[in-house]
Amino acid sequence: MPGFTCCVPGCYNNSHRDKALHFYTFPKDAELRRLWLKNVSRAGVSGCFSTFQPTTGHRLCSVHFQGGRKTYTVRVPTIFPLRGVNERKVARRPAGAAAARRRQQQQQQQQQQQQQQQQQQQQQQQQQQQQQSSPSASTAQTAQLQPNLVSASAAVLLTLQATVDSSQAPGSVQPAPITPTGEDVKPIDLTVQVEFAAAEGAAAAAAASELQAATAGLEAAECPMGPQLVVVGEEGFPDTGSDHSYSLSSGTTEEELLRKLNEQRDILALMEVKMKEMKGSIRHLRLTEAKLREELREKDRLLAMAVIRKKHGM
């Protein structure tokens, strides 16, 4: 039986069965052991202690020995009657070590919080510097674009004047219309004539290119954050081409989502059916294996009987 039994002759109190009792171990000192042995109660004792030499492995129950050193109390039923397992003493840590550990944890937490605050402050400073640098860059771009705009506007005026002069040639003079107020208004033909000279054509092309560059610069200055993507059409995002059942594009509707969920459920149901079929086939194979083993055993028995008959000449 697991546990400890009292060493008093005729006493069978067990530490595993009698949980209400306490059990005491004899001390190491020989004088104390002799004193304990003298103080053992003789009530119900069927033998004598004249030749008994107690050791530290002997236990006394609280029925025959009052006091002493309490060594073992059964709290939970156990199957380990070993002294090292049942009487393992819990190593008590000093209170100072626990307090030092708590202080160390608090210091580590404070250091982590300080590091996080410093990182946040650095990020805020970087954002402020970026915000301050962006307006200055935009003003510098506009200052650089102003002379280009002036030169482009002058070139445009020159080309318009040249077209007006060419349209007022001797063969193409048209009467000026008269407004209801009586003022003469001269029409300006802005269409490009084929009879332009080579120099005028080159000047017009240069002016047009400068005008395009100036307008592009103005658009870039008005948008300091850089060129923006303008999406034209019904679909807000391009098709990435991912068409497997787990991909959800941004334009997924409720019907498509339900359809995909139903597909997944169908797949799971099919997998469950396949698993049931596999379990049935495994069970059938096991039954077949048992039958074959039984047949083999029967054949071995018959063969053994035949060999025995041959040996005995039956």
Curated annotation (Swiss-Prot):
A GO molecular function held by the record: DNA-binding transcription repressor activity, RNA polymerase II-specific
Species for this entry: Homo sapiens (Human)
Tissue localization of expression: Expressed in skin fibroblasts.
Protein role: Transcription factor, which has both transcriptional activation and repression activities. Also modulates chromatin accessibility. In complex with HCFC1 and ZNF143, regulates the expression of several genes, including AP2S1, ESCO2, OPHN1, RBL1, UBXN8 and ZNF32. May regulate the expression of genes that encode both cytoplasmic and mitochondrial ribosomal proteins. Required for normal mitochondrial development and function. Regulates mitochondrial gene expression, including that of components of the electron transport chain.
Main localisation: nucleus
Subcellular location: Nucleus; Cytoplasm
One of the protein's GO biological processes: negative regulation of transcription by RNA polymerase II
Stretches the record annotates as Disordered: 85-111
Pfam families: THAP (PF05485)
InterPro entries: THAP_Znf
Coiled-coil intervals, chain numbering: 255-305
Biased composition (Low complexity): 93-111
UniProt-listed SMART domains: DM3, THAP
Family membership: Belongs to the THAP11 family.
Name of this protein: THAP domain-containing protein 11
Transmembrane segments: none
Record's disease association: Methylmalonic aciduria and homocystinuria type cblL: An autosomal recessive disorder of cobalamin metabolism clinically characterized by early-onset seizures, and profound global developmental delay with severe intellectual disability. Metabolic features are mild methylmalonic aciduria, low-normal plasma methionine, and high-normal plasma homocysteine. Spinocerebellar ataxia 51: A form of spinocerebellar ataxia, a clinically and genetically heterogeneous group of cerebellar disorders. Patients show progressive incoordination of gait and often poor coordination of hands, speech and eye movements, due to degeneration of the cerebellum with variable involvement of the brainstem and spinal cord. SCA51 is an autosomal dominant form with age-dependent penetrance and genetic anticipation.
Subunit field text: Forms homodimers. Interacts via HBM with HCFC1. Forms a complex with HCFC1 and ZNF143.
Domain of life: Eukaryota
Keywords, ordered alphabetically: Activator, Coiled coil, Cytoplasm, Disease variant, DNA-binding, Epilepsy, Intellectual disability, Metal-binding, Neurodegeneration, Nucleus, Repressor, Spinocerebellar ataxia, Transcription, Transcription regulation, Zinc, Zinc-finger
Residue ranges covered by zinc fingers (THAP-type): 1-80
